[in-house]
């Protein structure tokens, strides 16, 4: 897959194009230019390190939405075995913006649930761009209650711009579905591990993100509203999105300082989409450790900690 570069990555894109051209020349001729290719590769890596070491919140928001980032089904394929997808909410329909089912994690049976976006236009429309309707959240809750019934740990992956705000979704009880998930997740009698892998958009993310451990990938975001949405409300223009992103505190390191996130999972150089394999290794190492810890904690303590976590959200201070 040809890499897609964001606007602030254009200097990296130019170097990558030069490297590709030199590789083509080397393949088509007897000239040895491997030293020059190696020099440009090092220059590209150094430039990438420099750019990504000082990303603004607005740029991190762009990375979190990168079209080539790994999605929930990519994590399921890499981290789990024997995945059996389960469908439908048993009330209205099957929402393809939420995927989930039974799987094995290191041989242990678990329930995995997550948002799913699409890669191409047809799939994006089918998945509703990762924005669940009420039936998606009710499907997620049905799966998590099934996990509770059989004593299976729950692992969730969060990546959504937010819950779908359409008329039909509101008519079918979007806010009720989200609220019910929050209520039920606080008392689900099995370990719950949550990982934000891309966008963590408001209640649409929180509805599957109440857990014993909440993780974020290094360049993911988590916020009550998108920077563009916030800017449109406060300044009546989306052009102020960068200012909104700065004020909202949407980044993983900022949220960890506020004790809203347990672990910030390091991403490969250039973001998770640049090296799926390394990303999966990093995520798996964290989930293995947390699952072991969660299963060693008495259930009453686990539930108490989880409830205290959600009740601590929304702290403020007066200057």
Curated annotation (Swiss-Prot):
<keyword id="KW-0808">Transferase</keyword>
<keyword id="KW-0547">Nucleotide-binding</keyword>
<comment type="similarity">
    <text>Belongs to the AccA family.</text>
</comment>
<comment type="subunit">
    <text>Acetyl-CoA carboxylase is a heterohexamer composed of biotin carboxyl carrier protein (AccB), biotin carboxylase (AccC) and two subunits each of ACCase subunit alpha (AccA) and ACCase subunit beta (AccD).</text>
</comment>
<dbReference type="GO" id="GO:0016743">
    <property type="term" value="F:carboxyl- or carbamoyltransferase activity"/>
</dbReference>
<dbReference type="InterPro" id="IPR011763">
    <property type="entry name" value="COA_CT_C"/>
</dbReference>
<keyword id="KW-0444">Lipid biosynthesis</keyword>
<comment type="function">
    <text>Component of the acetyl coenzyme A carboxylase (ACC) complex. First, biotin carboxylase catalyzes the carboxylation of biotin on its carrier protein (BCCP) and then the CO(2) group is transferred by the carboxyltransferase to acetyl-CoA to form malonyl-CoA.</text>
</comment>
<dbReference type="Pfam" id="PF03255">
    <property type="entry name" value="ACCA"/>
</dbReference>
<keyword id="KW-0275">Fatty acid biosynthesis</keyword>
<feature type="domain" description="CoA carboxyltransferase C-terminal">
    <location>
        <begin position="39"/>
        <end position="293"/>
    </location>
</feature>
<dbReference type="GO" id="GO:2001295">
    <property type="term" value="P:malonyl-CoA biosynthetic process"/>
</dbReference>
<keyword id="KW-0276">Fatty acid metabolism</keyword>
<dbReference type="GO" id="GO:0006633">
    <property type="term" value="P:fatty acid biosynthetic process"/>
</dbReference>
<dbReference type="InterPro" id="IPR029045">
    <property type="entry name" value="ClpP/crotonase-like_dom_sf"/>
</dbReference>
<dbReference type="GO" id="GO:0003989">
    <property type="term" value="F:acetyl-CoA carboxylase activity"/>
</dbReference>
<dbReference type="GO" id="GO:0005524">
    <property type="term" value="F:ATP binding"/>
</dbReference>
<keyword id="KW-0963">Cytoplasm</keyword>
<dbReference type="GO" id="GO:0009317">
    <property type="term" value="C:acetyl-CoA carboxylase complex"/>
</dbReference>
<comment type="pathway">
    <text>Lipid metabolism; malonyl-CoA biosynthesis; malonyl-CoA from acetyl-CoA: step 1/1.</text>
</comment>
<keyword id="KW-0443">Lipid metabolism</keyword>
<dbReference type="InterPro" id="IPR001095">
    <property type="entry name" value="Acetyl_CoA_COase_a_su"/>
</dbReference>
<keyword id="KW-0067">ATP-binding</keyword>
<protein>
    <recommendedName>
        <fullName>Acetyl-coenzyme A carboxylase carboxyl transferase subunit alpha</fullName>
        <ecNumber>2.1.3.15</ecNumber>
    </recommendedName>
</protein>
